């Protein structure tokens, strides 16, 4: 997601929810920016959860006791599940805040604590920024941090680094070799790819996937129907998705 895109109003979401029902969509996923800065987010979730399960990817920094209570009420009133994924990139302020911003670690952990107290079991998503050999130790450090915040059996998902946006400057851009070739698709289960079964609604129309909303060629139309066609897998991010599966 990206901060240069605007929030979706409830009217816009409602229009796409109606279209999605006709197309047999079975699951909904909200990302940003930060979805919970959208003042329509709670009613959007209410209307979405009336027709299917929803997942929200949040940085966890803007929750208040009031918004958590509202979330819990919305979740409990629905027959469908509400899943929350909280992005944290380090297990302490020293490792997280240089990536996410000053003070964000403390705010995110506070958000996780409130979610757990309200009965949610958030998935903590972490972009891998460390060498492979450091993985087990870092994973254990995350578990300790989350247990200390009251999350007894934390759900943790390590994500590959996407060399897009700020990450392009922080680490490196994609190399020319990080592309999908025709040969690579032979005998490959393409259902592993995000774009094989979903589309991303933005305030500028419908894009092929959330990773490529900045790419002009990834915007496929104004409706889900228009955007449902095939897409050429020509981007570096497509290669990451190919290697790691839908993220």
What are these regions, as identified by a protein language model?
Residues 3-13, 90-98, 118-126, 144-156, ...:
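Short flexible/disordered coil segments
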Residues 23-29, 51, 55, 78-88, ...:
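Conserved C-terminal portion of the radical SAM core fold
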Residues 166-247:
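Accessory C-terminal segments flanking Radical SAM cores
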């Amino acid at each position: 997601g990206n901060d240069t895109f605007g929030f979706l109003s409830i009217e816009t979401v409602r229009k796409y929810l109606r279209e999605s029902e006709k197309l047999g969509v079975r699951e909904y996923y909200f990302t940003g920016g930060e979805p919970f800065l959208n003042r329509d987010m709670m009613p959007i979730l209410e209307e979405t959860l009336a027709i299917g399960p929803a997942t929200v990817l949040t940085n966890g920094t803007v929750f208040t006791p009031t918004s958590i209570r509202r979330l819990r009420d919305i979740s409990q009133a629905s027959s469908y599940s509400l899943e929350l994924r909280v992005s944290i990139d380090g297990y302490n302020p020293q490792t997280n805040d240089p990536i996410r911003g000053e003070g964000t670690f403390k705010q995110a952990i506070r958000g996780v604590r409130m979610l757990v107290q309200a009965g949610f079991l958030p998935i903590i998503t972490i972009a891998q920024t460390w060498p492979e050999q450091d993985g087990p130790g870092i994973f254990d450090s995350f578990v300790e941090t989350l247990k200390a915040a009251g999350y007894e059996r934390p759900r943790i998902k390590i994500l590959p680094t996407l060399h897009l946006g700020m990450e392009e400057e922080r680490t490196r851009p994609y190399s020319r070799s990080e592309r999908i070739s025709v040969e690579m698709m032979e005998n490959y289960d393409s259902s592993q790819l995000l774009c094989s079964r979903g589309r991303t609604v933005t305030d500028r129309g419908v894009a092929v996937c959330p990773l490529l909303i900045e790419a002009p060629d990834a915007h496929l139309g104004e409706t889900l129907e228009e955007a449902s066609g095939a897409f050429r897998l020509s981007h570096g991010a497509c290669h990451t998705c190919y290697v790691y599966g839908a993220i």
